[in-house]
From Swiss-Prot:
Residues 133-148 have a biased composition (Acidic residues). This is UPF0201 protein MJ1564. It comes from the Archaea. Residues 149-163 have a biased composition (Basic and acidic residues). PANTHER family: UPF0201 PROTEIN TK1335. Belongs to the UPF0201 family. InterPro entries: PAB1135-like (IPR002739), Ribosomal_uL5_dom_sf (IPR022803). Pfam families: RNA_binding (PF01877). Gene3D superfamilies: 3.30.1440.10.
Length: 170
């Protein structure tokens, strides 16, 4: 897995505060500042670690919201989203819809990795605020579906019997 990070620095922003915002979420990121023109530039970087992001999502109890954002931004082998700079500056995760001012994050799966598995690791599903094992949940749902189908067949058989009973009573 590789994480690509980009954040534009507007003329009204301090480039080092923007850098701090990125490093608060991705402390192991290797960042480079690229001058775009006299007015602003952009921080670009990469990391392989999402540990701090995972920790913050859990401590802020926003795993389900994060999961929705990660799934919404998912492509075949990646997911992308934006983080709010101001929130990141104070060490918090807040997903941003402002594509012009946020921190752009793209998580790329390696060839032998499944992006959905990475998303499940970063933001697992919860039930009542507790992380649940999705594999067990899927097995449980399949079992419930199977039982519902069996019940449906029993009801159909009972209906057939009743129809036969009613027709023979004439």
């Amino acid at each position: 897995m590789e994480v690509i990070i980009k954040a534009k620095v507007k003329p009204t922003e301090d480039k080092y505060k923007v850098k701090k915002a990125i490093l608060n979420i991705f402390p192991k990121a290797k960042l480079t500042f690229i001058e775009k023109d006299n007015e602003f530039g952009e921080w670009e970087g990469k990391t392989k670690s999402v540990e701090k992001l995972k920790e913050l999502l859990r401590s802020q109890s926003i795993l389900d919201a994060a999961r929705m954002v990660l799934e919404k931004g998912m492509t075949e082998n990646a997911t992308k989203f934006y983080l709010n700079k101001q929130a990141a500056y104070v060490g918090a995760v807040n997903f941003d819809i402002d594509t012009h001012g946020g921190i752009f994050v793209k998580i790329l799966a390696d060839e032998n990795e499944d992006i959905m598995k990475i998303i499940k690791d970063i933001a697992p599903r919860t039930k009542g605020g507790v992380i649940i094992n999705e594999d067990e949940l899927e097995e449980e749902e399949e079992k419930e579906d199977s039982e519902e189908i069996k019940e449906g067949h029993k009801e159909e058989n009972n209906l057939k019997i009743k129809v036969i009973d009613n027709s023979s009573g004439d």
